[in-house]
């Protein structure tokens, strides 16, 4: 025995020649570690470690410690200590006890205040023989009504009045947070991998959950090695099926598959209602009891059965057979099964378990001591005419109804047998009785939960308001559906009252949260009056901190909120879950400082890989921009570059404030891996921080230009405006309403940058300023109803005028009149005059046959000398140019 100085950990080694060969340090306990030593009062009654090299050939190092946890984690079970044991050596898991093997770490929960004797013996590596002798000396003189029966071939005789141990131990499979005793459900686990066996023919398949989270207290294989010798207790409990209760009397002889039932203190009152109904027949009379149900039996050296189970199941398909032709099928329970026992097939001999409780009448013949069966089966009911093919060997019997004819040909027999086997494999779900209970576990329990959720939705709709007559019918229907759903879910009034309390004590594991939701039918629903009182508080929490939690329903990280509660002391309560929108509102209660700290932690919270919803590789995170950006203009995160750099998908919503600028204040939806989301989040935060730091030194200046130039400033698709903003590092936003024939806009940035932007804008206006005194520029007023005619489809007409006249023509607004426009023709005098003439002809002001030089104030053609037809002038000019070229 050796003890470490740093931590209160027992390290024991079997090899006395060498000291500690290997130490496996357990995980750091979250609360308190209780030191165990030889001077402890609790351990005075227990024998000291005595080693026997003949029995223990391989050195084994075990590390054990005890950790105290609050009782609120285990409501309904008086548990205050956890004993974590780990063992490690060089043995293979498929070898027997005599060879080298190893076992995985397991967690055991003790339901008493002190460590139990078997666990203490095993931690100290006390041999079996010395342990039994010592336990006989300690418990000598005690009176026990239930004598212990043991196998005389392998164990030396001890006093039958002495119990082997006083208290049972709850062993929960790792990981611990997935198997919480609070949320016990009567549906057990079953082993899925049944095709792997060790050297002794033992089935060590892994456990698998049936559909959803099902809690079960399971004794694992290697935790009771060398000290639990399968005593034949007369285990009597209300949770045991009454059809096998008589077979558990003290008169039954010891079998290697004898399994202890769970203790009465572990019974759950929620599941003490209707007893289970099996839908398969068990009539295996010729199966060897040492090899059947090997998944529930483990042998240490000298073939001592050392496993303890608390399950009820049975083989329902014979898919796998070992070398001896034994049935090693999967194990499954078809309906709610209370915590009972798993028995060997010999316990069910002479029994024929059929569809319903009414069809089975079991009784015990006290005179003969044998069990009989009485079976009722309706010949006319076609549902009961099912074929059950167990296997091809003679060890297990075939329970099926033969057809009227016999098949004489052996090949036809083989064909029919294979055909029945294929059909039996395909039929994984069937009807049990006339009420059409579905045997498929997932579909069966999903149907119950759907009915319960539908009843809750109907109650909500009823509360929102209907007609008086409709309300009554609706309420009656809701009450019936809810009552039936609660009966099927086996929920009592106490369970419904405890539903709120259970949902406030969230576990660290998301699977536990989902298990509670499935067990009790969703989170607690608050009344409308309570929601009105908390409306302001919830709105503030949603505005400031809950955008990070605005994740689709089902992917909300509820378990991480418990960490925030422990870190800040702020109490978080889930108020409502909206299915359509998928948003969940959380109420924060506590001191103002605690609420601020909780909000910061919620903002910084990123979804972990452990909380990926529906098994997807990508996760969703909502990034909320700071509130200071609401008063800014022209800020953009450049999401496209972030997507390429980080390898994620960003969906954003923009709030448009004007023509040129926008601000992304809505949350951004990021989809990708955890590392890429971390990288994108850091990039966005750095950009926003840099932008906000620069905003402190910026100012806003308003500037106005004539309304005829604002389109030139913006440019085609905003090209001119973007170049000005990029060069000057400013943000320019035009106002939508123009007053006094002026286009006003605001420029935000540093003082030097604002001056530079104004200079760029003045350059554009100066280049496009028309000179009225220039004889080479003509302006023609175009009415509003003629603008489309002058431009033409896709600008065909105005382009024709430009090509014929070789002048620059463009439309411009008229000061004081936003409807009519000017057609400005510039260039040479002849070209501009000809373009103005074509414009007037197009809009119908003049007749092409009549030349008017001094027509009206709509043009300034009076400055041009009287001439002939402008078309003749242009023809003469072109003829002269061609002549010169020749």
Swiss-Prot record:
Mitochondrion among keywords:
no
| Biased composition annotated in UniProt, kind: Basic residues | 369-388, 415-425
Q: Which UniProt keywords apply?
A: Repeat, RNA-binding
Q: Which GO terms describe its biological process?
A: mRNA processing; regulation of alternative mRNA splicing, via spliceosome
Which parts of this chain are annotated as the region Disordered? 359-433
Offer a single GO CC term for the protein: nucleus
Question: In its keyword annotation, does this UniProt entry include Hydrolase?
Answer: no
Q: Which Pfam families match?
A: KH_1
Q: Which residues form the KH domain?
A: 698-761, 775-839
Q: Where is the composition biased (Basic and acidic residues)?
A: 359-368
Q: Which SMART domains match?
A: KH (SM00322)
Give the superkingdom in one word. Eukaryota
Q: What GO MF annotations does this protein's record show?
A: mRNA binding
PANTHER family xrefs? KH DOMAIN CONTAINING RNA BINDING PROTEIN (PTHR10288)
The protein depicted here goes by the name: KH domain-containing protein hrpk-2
């Amino acid at each position: 025995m050796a003890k470490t100085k740093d931590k209160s950990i027992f390290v024991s080694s079997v090899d006395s020649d060498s000291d500690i060969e290997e130490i496996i340090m357990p995980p750091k306990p979250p609360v308190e570690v209780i030191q165990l030593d030889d001077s402890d009062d609790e351990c005075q009654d227990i024998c000291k470690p005595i080693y026997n090299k003949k029995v223990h050939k391989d050195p084994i190092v075990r590390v054990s410690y005890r950790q105290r946890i609050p009782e609120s984690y285990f409501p309904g079970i008086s548990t205050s200590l956890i004993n974590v044991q780990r063992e490690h050596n060089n043995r293979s898991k498929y070898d027997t006890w005599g060879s080298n093997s190893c076992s995985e770490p397991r967690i055991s929960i003790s339901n008493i205040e002190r460590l139990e004797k078997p666990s203490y013996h095993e931690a100290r590596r006390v041999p079996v023989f010395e342990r039994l002798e010592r336990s006989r000396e300690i418990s000598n003189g005690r009176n026990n009504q239930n004598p212990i029966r043991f196998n005389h071939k392998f164990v030396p005789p001890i006093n039958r009045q002495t119990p082997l141990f006083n208290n049972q131990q709850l062993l929960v499979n790792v990981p611990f947070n997935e198997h919480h005793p609070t949320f016990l459900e009567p549906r057990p686990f079953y082993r899925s991998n049944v095709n792997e066996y060790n050297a002794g023919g033992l089935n060590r398949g892994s456990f698998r959950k049936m559909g959803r989270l099902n809690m079960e207290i399971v004794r694992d294989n290697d935790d009771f090695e060398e000290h639990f010798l399968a005593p034949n207790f007369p285990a009597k409990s209300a949770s045991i099926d009454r059809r096998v209760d008589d077979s558990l009397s003290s008169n039954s002889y010891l079998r290697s598959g004898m399994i202890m039932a769970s203790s009465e203190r572990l019974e759950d009152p929620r599941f003490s209602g209707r007893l289970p109904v099996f839908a398969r027949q068990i009539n295996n009379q010729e199966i060897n009891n040492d090899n059947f149900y090997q998944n529930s039996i483990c042998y240490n050296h000298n073939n001592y059965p050392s496993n303890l189970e608390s399950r009820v199941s049975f083989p329902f398909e014979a898919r796998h057979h070992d070398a001896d032709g034994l049935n090693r099928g999967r194990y499954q329970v078809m309906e709610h099964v209370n915590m009972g026992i798993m028995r060997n097939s010999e316990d069910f001999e002479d029994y024929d378990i059929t569809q319903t409780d009414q069809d089975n009448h079991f009784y015990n013949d006290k005179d003969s001591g044998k069990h009989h069966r009485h079976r009722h089966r309706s010949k006319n009911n076609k549902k009961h005419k099912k074929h059950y093919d167990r296997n091809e060997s003679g060890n297990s019997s075939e329970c099926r109804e033969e057809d009227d004819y016999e098949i004489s040909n052996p090949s036809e027999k083989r064909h029919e047998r294979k055909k029945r086997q294929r059909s039996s494999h395909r039929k994984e779900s069937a009807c049990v009785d006339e009420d059409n209970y579905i045997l498929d576990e997932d579909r069966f329990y999903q149907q119950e939960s759907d009915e319960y959720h539908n009843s809750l939705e109907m109650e909500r709709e009823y509360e929102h308001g209907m007609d008086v007559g409709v309300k009554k019918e609706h309420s009656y229907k809701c009450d019936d559906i809810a009552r039936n759903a609660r009966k099927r879910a086996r929920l009592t009034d106490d369970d419904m009252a405890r539903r709120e309390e259970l949902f406030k004590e969230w576990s660290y594991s998301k699977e536990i949260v989902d298990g509670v939701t499935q067990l009790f039918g969703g989170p607690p629903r608050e009344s409308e009056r309570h929601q009105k009182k908390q409306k302001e508080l919830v709105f503030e929490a949603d505005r400031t901190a809950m955008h990070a939690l605005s994740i689709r329903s089902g992917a909300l990280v509820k378990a991480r909120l418990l960490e925030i509660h422990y870190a800040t002391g702020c109490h978080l309560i889930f108020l409502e879950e909206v299915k359509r929108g998928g948003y969940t509102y959380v109420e924060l209660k506590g001191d103002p400082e605690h609420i601020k700290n909780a909000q910061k932690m919620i903002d910084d919270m990123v979804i972990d890989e452990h909380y990926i919803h529906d098994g997807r590789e990508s996760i969703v995170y909502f990034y909320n921009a700071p509130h200071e950006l609401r008063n800014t203009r022209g800020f953009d995160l450049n999401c496209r570059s972030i997507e390429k750099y980080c390898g994620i998908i960003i969906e954003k919503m923009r709030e448009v404030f004007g023509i040129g600028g926008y601000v992304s204040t809505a949350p951004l939806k990021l989809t990708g891996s955890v590392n890429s989301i971390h990288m994108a989040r850091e990039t966005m935060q750095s950009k926003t921080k840099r932008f906000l730091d620069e905003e402190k030194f910026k100012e806003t200046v308003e500037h106005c230009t004539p309304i005829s130039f604002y389109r030139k400033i913006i440019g085609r698709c905003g090209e001119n405006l973007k170049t000005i903003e990029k060069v000057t590092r400013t943000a320019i936003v035009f106002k939508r309403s123009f007053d006094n024939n002026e286009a006003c806009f605001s420029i935000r940035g540093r003082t030097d940058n604002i001056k530079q932007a104004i200079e760029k804008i003045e350059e554009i206006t100066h280049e496009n300023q028309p000179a009225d005194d220039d004889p080479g520029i003509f302006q023609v007023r175009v009415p509003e109803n003629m603008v489309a005619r002058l431009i033409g489809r896709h600008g065909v007409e105005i382009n024709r005028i430009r090509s014929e006249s070789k002048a620059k023509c463009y439309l411009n607004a008229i000061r004081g009149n936003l409807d009519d426009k000017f057609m400005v023709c510039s260039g040479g005098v002849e070209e501009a005059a000809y373009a103005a003439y074509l414009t007037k002809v197009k809009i119908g002001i003049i007749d092409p046959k009549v030349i008017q030089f001094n027509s009206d104030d709509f043009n300034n053609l009076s400055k041009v000398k009287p001439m002939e037809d402008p078309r003749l002038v242009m023809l003469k000019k072109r003829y002269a140019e061609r002549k010169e070229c020749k």
